[in-house]
Each structure stands twice: as C-alpha cells, then as structure tokens.
Amino acid sequence: MNDLRLKKDRKLLEILKTMAPGTDMREGLENILRAKTGGLVVLGDNEEVMKLSDGGFKINSEYSASYIYELAKMDGAIILSSDLKKIVRANVQLVPDSSIPTFETGTRHRTAHRVAKQTGNVVVAISQRRNVITIYKDDIKYILRDSSIILARANQAIQTLEKYVAVLDRVMGNLNLLEFEDLCTLHDVVAAIQRTEMVMRVVTEIDRYICELGNEGRLISMQLNELVKNVEQDGMLIIRDYCQNEMNYSKVCETIQSMSSEEFLNSEAISKVMGYGDVPLIDTLISPRGYRMTSKIPRIPFIVIENLVKNFKELKKILEASHEDLDKVEGIGEARARAIKSGLRKLKEQTIIRKQL
C-alpha cells in the first residue's frame, strides 16, 4: 500500500530528506539556530516567489552553510535556487497576500506560512526566541526536532510496531487457516484489514522519523524493513480477495488509508467500504478469490496468478482443481501446475503446524 500512501505524507518525507542531519541544508539551519538571530529561508526562486519579493540584493553564489549563517544576521529573507545549490538573494522583504488565513502569531512565522500557501514553495522559519525550526509547505506545518529526541521516539515507535506485528501475525495465521477450510467470515477479514492498517500507520510515522534522522536513521530503517517485509502486499491482496466484484481495490485501499483512527477501528465502516451493506459481520461467510494465498507460492509470476483467479474465481476451486484443470489456464504448463498444487499443499501444512504451536 506504500505507493498509495497519502500524498501529504509523501510530500513531507521529500522535504525532510533535504533537511536531514548530515545535509548542508540542515547544517546551515542549525548554525542560524545556534546564533539565535532567527531567519527566513525560501526554497526555490520561481516567478511566484520573485513577485512577492521586495528589496534585498542579488548574491548568486554557491550554497554554503557558513554563507547562509552570515546572511541570516540581516533582517530579510534568504532565497535559494530550486535545486538548493545557490543562494540567489538575501535581505529580501517578502510581501504575501495579507488576506491568506494563518494561525501563526509571530511576524516571521505569519509571513512564512502565507508565502508557502501562496507560492507552494517550502519556506523555513527559524525562531529567534523559541529556538525552533519550522517548515511550511502549502497547508503543511512541521517542526524539526533535535536528533536525540527523534531517535528516542523512533525507538519507542519500533517497540510499538513489534507488538502490533505480533498481533497481526496471529490474526493472519487464523485467516490463513480459515481460508483453507473455506470458513472465513466478514468479521475475520475486517479484523485482518484493521490490524494491517494499524501496522502501516506506525510504519508511516517511523518513515518520517527515518527521513528526519538522515544518516542516523539507518539502524531504525533496517529494523523496520525486517519487521514489515510483506505486510503492505498482504494487506492490499486481502482487499483484492474480498472486496465486491465491481469495486476498484486500489480506491478501496485509498479510502481506508484516508479514514481517521476512529473510523477505521469501526468494523461496520470497513465492511461498507468493501462493498458489503448492513450485514452481520460474524454470520456472513465469504470466500477469498485466492490472490494472497497463491502469491505465496515461489516463482509464480503475478500475471499467471491473475489468470488463475480469473478462471477459477475462488481459492476453494483452485484448491480442488486437478493438474489437468490447472494446465488449461493460460501461462500454466505441466511444471507450473505441479508447483501450484504442491505449493498450496505445503502452505496448508505450514498453517496447520503454526496453529498447533
């Protein structure tokens, strides 16, 4: 589901990467912060920014953390080139539209917020008194924090994620067994979707910490990748297995991702998004199409899995199919038919053994 993660999050992650510890940009901002002079930095010298600029002087010099620190001693804003490689202008007065709403109080932060909204550029405000770096982009406001604080929060989030993944594994193990026995209820499916989304929301938060930590986030990144190897893929395939026929599973995924915490914990709300009306979740038996389970068989391309599901419609019928029935499907020869039969048999055996442990 990562490619469908909300655009706002992706936009913020890209911004944080440019200002992560170890980058020249972060070094320059930290220098201004330590000097307690305050500052306003606009990332990008496009036409919209230049229209709002008044006064100041041209620099057109290569970006340097020490240059930006010296230029911040003046009252005006600093404008950098779009690729962040040049300091274009300094000591600029920014004159955004005063009718643009902002909830900021200080003059520097009000200006930064309005310029970001009006131009769509990233604007960074460094507070003189509060010792805080604030990033603005469109409606996004994000406060950069010290690496030690971020690292502590990231470690705490990893611990939470470990617990969530352990619960998800149990829920998935139960769903696997029910799928092989064709005894799945809507309640079991919704529980798996909810647990997957809970894990992915923590992953999104940790991704943000990793971007903000830069080089210091490598260990956290490795731990994250180890914990959530196939969670996203499985989550999407559950939705593809169970959403109503005429529905676009990608849009169902996006709808679930955009739900508030209260909404996605409401089982009936998830059920409705999946295309089921007001039906009792525990009493409604549903059969999977088989995308998720067949995708676990090694060396079977996804195009073949799609042909398989298209032909048999349900996992139950794929399990019951003979070698000859499988052989008739486009892209499946005798060798693949054997691989599918033995692969599903092994998966069923593993599922039963895990349940007994």
From Swiss-Prot:
It is an enzyme of class 2 (transferase). PROSITE patterns: DAC. Pfam families: DAC, DisA-linker, HHH. It catalyses: 2 ATP = 3',3'-c-di-AMP + 2 diphosphate. PANTHER family: DIADENYLATE CYCLASE (PTHR34185), DNA INTEGRITY SCANNING PROTEIN DISA (PTHR34185:SF3). Belongs to the DisA family. Homooctamer. Participates in a DNA-damage check-point that is active prior to asymmetric division when DNA is damaged. DisA forms globular foci that rapidly scan along the chromosomes during sporulation, searching for lesions. When a lesion is present, DisA pauses at the lesion site. This triggers a cellular response that culminates in a temporary block in sporulation initiation. This is DNA integrity scanning protein DisA.
